[in-house]
Amino acid sequence: MERVETQPLGYLLHRLTSALRSEVTVTVLTPLGLSFPQYLCMRLLSQSPSMSNAQLARGINVSPQAMNRVVRGLQKRSLVVRAAVVPSGRSQPIELSFEGAELLKRTNSGVRAAERRVLAEFGEQDRRDLLKLLATLGHG
């Protein structure tokens, strides 16, 4: 069996991501009628309001066509809105609605609980250190 220190980082991150995504989807998102891409879209919009479909697609690494389906699903539930007036160009900025922001608040607490379950073998300081390392790597 290969030692953990010699396994490729991408493989280890994929395993962690898969475990976390599964836990979040089953315990938090599915009961609320959300998909993981919808949650990520709402999260991005909460951090950077008025994003275009293309910006959202790049933000969660999906095609613009796939993001359009995600946004339409959120629009049908009144969780996001497209601006009625376009400031410039062709893209209609997308924003989180009040209902979407409220649902995201509820979702975030469940996501945090799912993270704690997935990382249950870590102590609190180890979890904080891991989050700091991942944040640093993600901005590099």
Q: Where are the model-predicted features located?
A:
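C-terminal regulatory/oligomerization modules of transcriptional regulators
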Residues: M1-E2, Q125-G140
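Residues within helix-turn-helix
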Residues: N53-A54, Q65, R72, Q92
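Short glycine/proline-centered loop/turn elements that form peptide/ligand docking sites
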Residues: P31-S35, A66-R69, G73, G123
